[in-house]
Amino acid sequence: MVYMISYDLHSPTKNREEVEKDIESFGTWCKYLTTTYLISTSSSLETVTDKCVSHLDGNDAMIIAKVEKPIKGWLSQKQWDWIKRYL
């Protein structure tokens, strides 16, 4: 399963390392934008969400969505290679 995770922390440096550590702990990932990742994991959406939101507070935001083909965008070749491999 591939999920897109995008987040916005009210205080940009607050908990960023913890949030990114949790996202990256799911194994295979690619960071696309400053606060947007794609991850490839066998974990459920609920498991990913529960772990990733643990460092957020009421002023922060996060969305996690399942990603399926087709997919379009403006990315580097390295990012497209990741998508082709895992999606």
Q: Where are these predicted regions, by residue range?
A:
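Extended, hydrophobic alpha-helical segments
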Residues: 1-28, 38-43
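Loop/helix-junction capping segments adjacent to catalytic residues or to phosphate/diphosphate-binding pockets
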Residues: 13, 46, 73
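Short amphipathic alpha-helices in soluble, non-transmembrane regions
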Residues: 18-24, 49-56
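Short linear sequence motifs
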Residues: 25, 30, 73-75
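Short Gly/Ser/Thr- and Asp/Glu-enriched loop/turn motifs at secondary-structure junctions
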Residues: 32-35
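C-terminal structural segments of small proteins and small subunits
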Residues: 53-87
